[in-house]
Amino acid sequence: MKVLFQARPDFMKNPAGDTVQMVSTGQELKNLGVEVHLSADPNIDLSPYDFVHIFNITRIKESYMFFLNAQKQKKKIIISPIYWPPNAYLKREGASSNALAVWRHLQPMRARLVSECTLLLPNSHIEMNVLQNDFLKTAPFQVVPNGFPDSFIGATSQLFREQFPSIPKEFVLCAARVSPRKNQQWLARICQELGLPLVLLGPVNDQKYFKDVKSFSNVIYIGTLQGKLLSSAYSAAKAHALPSWFETPGLSSIEAGACGTVVISTDQGSPSEYFQDMALYVHPLDDISLRSALEQSFNASPLPLMHHIQKHYSWSKVAEVTLETYRTVIVQ
């Protein structure tokens, strides 16, 4: 089996959740014997491939070009939409006045991909329900969840403590792009009011926003971590908080939970389908909900969620589900 993955051209330069999903799935599929190639070329010759797998319809312009190329060459098309309507986020105070209009203007492109592809692979049933609500017609679908690296199982705090000995023993962690959608400024303010150190990991998307977040004296920014050091950071944290405007469901929340850390998550998007009643949920900009979750996190047990995530959401298991969907497409 030979499959071509296609995604936005800057998926490695500006890594985000779609990057992790695509690269992790591809690596695990290779371990299962699938030949996986990556390309951001909208005119690539598709004759060597059984089908095309396109990631992310939020950044629709590139995905639309991949889609047209596949249709032109009469190839089957699988789409991981990674979709959530950003209406509330785009209407927030300080947002660009035309951002929502641009989003709506591009919806017909998304509608075409969603209705004319061979198979949709949403990350949750909640995401699929939203797709069915936002678009008149949708292709057949199979839910394929997001995951965490199998190597994170059994992580301990030792490596992180050795590398960063000055960080307080008890701290709240947020591993995510530092950007308004991830809502770290709000998190920093509430943590400061509670006297809690906040450690931030991840790339900076918005320098002005980053400066605003860093203005809080309790914030410690340590850049981007990977592999064993990242899993050790999760393990060292008292809680991991991702109070974003929406998540599907938030890769760092899955990773933190797998490492045995209490998870505080936004209630917007699909987190509840993954974490059920084993996480603490907050509503964006509801100070009381975040303050309460942070206070509860220091006495909450991370073990039920850890066992649940480790049982269901490793990337190796995700790849097995993905491969089964590929087989159904090939025989169609």
Feature locations, PLM:
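Short, structured helix-loop element that forms part of the nucleotide-activated donor/catalytic region
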Residues: 19, 197-222, 229
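Membrane-proximal helix-turn-helix segments that form the acceptor-binding/catalytic region
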Residues: 100-120
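Acidic anion/phosphate-binding donor-loop and adjacent secondary structure
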Residues: 132, 147-167
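Conserved donor-binding/catalytic core segment of Leloir-type glycosyltransferases
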Residues: 163-182, 188-193, 199
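Short alpha-helical donor nucleotide-sugar binding micro-motif in glycosyltransferases
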Residues: 224-225, 232-237
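Aromatic "clamp/platform" in nucleotide-sugar-dependent glycosyltransferases that forms part
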Residues: 245
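Short hydrophobic beta-strand element within catalytic cores of glycosyltransferases
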Residues: 262-265
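Conserved acidic donor-binding segment of nucleotide-sugar-dependent glycosyltransferases
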Residues: 279-288, 294-299
